[in-house]
Amino acid sequence: TSGVRVPHGDWIPADREGLTFCDATSAAFAMELPWEKLDVTTWSWQKVMGGEAAHGMLVLSPRAVERLESYSPPWPMPKLFRMAKGGKFSADIFSGATINTVSMLCVEDALDALKWVEQEGGQPAIVQRSEANLSALANWVGNSDWAEFLAPDVSTRSCTSICLTIGADWFT
């Protein structure tokens, strides 16, 4: 990690031809995401809300589903990645089909984390909490005589994957 984030989705054209892929592992639930411009978005349970690290989540936009239905690669696809059958999108993995046996403790852990998010005020409250944590750390860094953010640009500094560096003269 480098301690940075993309600050907004303004750079993604609304009339783009291709698909926009987003690894939102450190952003899901803790940052506002431009969902209307993201076609394939992934994250895992362990980030932001805490929890089990071995399981991933996938969100596909209607554009991504269209691509699945209109494009068939000339190479064999592993079963795990087959999301279309006979030119039609297969929603099996989005409606309960098991790809990999998930521990029910892991599922319960994720559900418990979602209940906590709801109890705290939902996703907007978690985004605010994450930004407040970054602000508290920024205040500390601002008063430190040795710590600096690895990402100097405030607009791209991540509130979840924070990286600090030693900036003291004696260290460099």
Enumerate the predicted regions with their spans.
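Active-site phosphate-binding strand-loop segment of PLP-dependent enzymes
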Residues: 1-25, 40
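Solvent-exposed alpha-helices and their adjacent loops that cap or buttress functional pockets
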Residues: 12-15, 32-36, 48-52, 154
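Catalytic P-loop NTPase motifs of RecA-like helicase/translocase cores
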Residues: 28-29
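Conserved hydrophobic/aromatic beta-strand scaffold that supports enzyme active sites
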Residues: 40, 55-59, 161-163
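Glycine-rich, charged/polar anion/phosphate-binding loops
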Residues: 42-45, 94-97, 145-149
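Conserved PLP-binding catalytic core of the aspartate aminotransferase-like
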Residues: 148-172
